[in-house]
Amino acid sequence: MALCLAHEKAFAQQEEPPLQQLVYSHSMPLSSPTTISQDRNGSIYVLDPLRNLLRLDSLGRPLDTFSPPTRGRISHIEAWNPMKILLFYEDRQEVLLLDRFLRPISSTDLRDINYEGMAKAATLSADDSFWLFDETNQTLSKLDLRLRQLTVETPLNLILDKARFDVRQMREYQNMVYMLDYNSGIYVFDNLGNYKGSIPFKGLAYIGFRENELYFVQDGKLNFYDLYTQQQRSLELPEGKAYITALAGDKQLYLFSKGKVDIYTWQ
C-alpha cells in the first residue's frame, strides 16, 4: 500500500511542461490500437486491416509481413527481442514464436502441455520462458517450455478485485513484470513472481516502456512515469484526435486510434 500511495502522490505533484513538439508525417490503417509492440531496434509491429502482422521500420515504412497460416485472433504481440517475437492467440490458447524474418520458430498449444487454466495474457521472460495470467484461477504463472511445466505460480486472489479485474497486458521489463489491469492499475512483480506493489493509473488500454520510463495515453496527453524516481512528465497531443495508445521511438511517435495509426516526428 505504501508503494501505491507514494506513486500516486508523485504523479500528482511532479508534472512538468512538455519538452517536445510533434510534426505529422503520415497515417496507416490497422485493425487494433492495442495489439501492437516495439522492438529494441525501434521497429514497430502492428496488425493490418486483414490482421496480418506488419513490421514497420523506424520511419513507419512497412518492412515485412507475416500472414498467419491458420485462423485465429492475435491478441498480444511482444517483440522487444526481435530475434524471438511472441504472438499470443487467446481464443486458441496458443503461443507462436517468430524469428527476425517473421518466420515461425515454434508453436505451443497450452492445452497440449496440461496447462489447466485459461490464459488471458502472455509475454516473454528474459530466460525464454512465458509469463501467463490465468483468468480462471487468478494466477500469475511462468511456463518453462524445456521442462514443459510451470516454474512459478503466484496466486492473485488477494491482490485482484475479483468483481472488477480486467487484465489487458503483461510485460517483463528491467527484471520486473508489469500487469495492466484496466480497472485497478498496474501490478508490479519481480522476475520470480513475487508481488512488489501497484501503480494506480486506471483506465489504461496499453502501456509502453522507454529507458527508465513507463508511458501511456490518457486525457489527451502522452504521460511518462519514471519507474525509479516516480516523477512524471507529459506531452499534449493534437486536439480533436481520439488517441488510445502510443509507441514512442527515438525520432518518431506512433499514436493509435480506432482503425489507424498516425505517425509523427519528434522535434
Go through the PLM ranges and name each one:
Residues 21-28, 61-67, 106-112, 149-161, ...:
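A short beta-strand motif characteristic of beta-propeller blades
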Residues 41-42, 82-83, 127-128, 174-175, ...:
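Short coil/turn segments that connect the beta-strands within blades of beta-propeller domains
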Residues 245-267:
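Blade-level signature of beta-propeller repeat domains, shared across WD40, Kelch, NHL, RCC1
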Residues 57-61, 99-103, 144-147, 190-194, ...:
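Short loop/turn segments that connect beta-strands within beta-propeller blades
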Residues 54, 96, 141, 187-188, ...:
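WD40 beta-propeller blade core
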Residues 31-37, 72-78, 116-122, 162-169, ...:
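Repeated scaffold domains used in trafficking and secretory/extracellular systems
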Residues 38, 46-49, 86-91, 132-136, ...:
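Conserved beta-strand positions in repeat-built beta-propeller and related beta-rich domains
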Residues 26-49:
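Beta-strand-rich domains and repeat architectures in extracellular enzymes and scaffolds
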